[in-house]
């Protein structure tokens, strides 16, 4: 049975997954975060390398910046959201998600177990993305894919949809945003957008399947990272300064940074053409000292 919600009262969110074939012919999966306003159909999608909790938080924050914060979000029983239910059926929230709800000021409602159709609006959105946005889609980097995704959202939100009998942008601006909260910038928000990472023994952090270098003079064990478009920024653990930045090429090769290992030192260069030349020979064969033994016969070579 179809139900209705007041403007700005309820959004629905979910993950979808799509298989990507790269230039070498191998395949991997990317996750599509989807959120939709149940009242007007305003929608937002974003792609991530995986559906980990840190990417759920980033996707939700970007969606709230795009369409405001509702009274509650309806979702299914994700591991990132809920641990289990108690004897009375009340949800026991995952501790980081519960803190996230408190910091941003919204509530979460869960579908009944094995009843995903309760959030039919976002289920249809995920299916629509797979049927409308993705077929024939070619991209070079996930950053490009997300730029195309937000343009697609802007287009879809600006045209009439019979299911909600309105143009989502118009109704959302006129009615939903009067009740939805505007997401304000805060230090807590920046922490969610910049996940924490441990620094490896060889001076790298691992993010989105790639390794990025950290300057050697930063001596703490953790830092924070944020991908903004085509640039990855690495911050200190307290978000007080940028340690370094990397161009995000999505290559599997390690990305080194300046001052990752040693400090650059002054070096003298020839000021005139070098005319003197000497010769270097190949080193003599290495004699390990065991060549006089005949190990196969157990005898000395004499």
Language-model-derived ranges and their functions:
Residues 1-43, 51-55, 102, 190-207:
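Mobile-element integrase/transposase regions
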Residues 45-70, 249-255:
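Active-site beta-loop-alpha junctions of metal-dependent nucleic acid enzymes
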Residues 69-89:
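Acidic/histidine-rich, metal-coordinating catalytic segments
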Residues 75-76, 87-88, 108-130, 145:
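RNase H-like two-metal-ion nuclease catalytic core shared by retroviral integrases
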Residues 90-108:
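Two-metal-ion acidic nuclease core segments, chiefly of the RNase H-like superfamily
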Residues 126-226:
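Active-site-proximal acidic segments at structured loop/helix or strand boundaries
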Residues 229-302:
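Protein C-terminal end segments and domain termini
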